[in-house]
Amino acid sequence: YLKDKRGQNYFPKTIPATGKKQFVFAPVAYAWAAYDETGMRVMTGGASGGQGFCEDVGQPCRTVVGTFRVYKKRGAECRSGEFPVETTGGGKMPYCMYFYQGYTIHAAFEVPYANTSHGCVRVWPSAAKWLNEEFITRGTQVVILPYPKNA
């Protein structure tokens, strides 16, 4: 994750201080940023959010947009309760951090310059481990920015 430069030129180095840590995902930039309590950016990286339409479930599956809080975390053993559809779950979601209903931030081995998930925010495994173990705690604010208007 230290070599992943995605997002460094997109996210500002500082944002208004809130007194709380923040994780921000920008679907338009395929990137995330972590900000400390003082509003200083401490890390950025590549991310992939939910795609416009998921064939296997027959509906749109973009990541929910808005401001949320992490309410549950799991470690390397975390698995989906829904996907893949054909097995009604079991898909690996290492270092998952739940922020709204079933939406999580979790590790993935593919983090393309595209939004390709069923709604979760996928980040590189080393980034997910760092976020889960070193940065995000229960109550950390998660901000999902809007998708591009024409996508």
Regions found by a protein language model. Give the residues of each.
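Exported/periplasmic cell-wall-interacting domains
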Residues: L2-K20, G58-T67, K72-A151
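A structural motif detector for short, solvent-exposed N-terminal "entry" segments of globular domains
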Residues: L2-F53
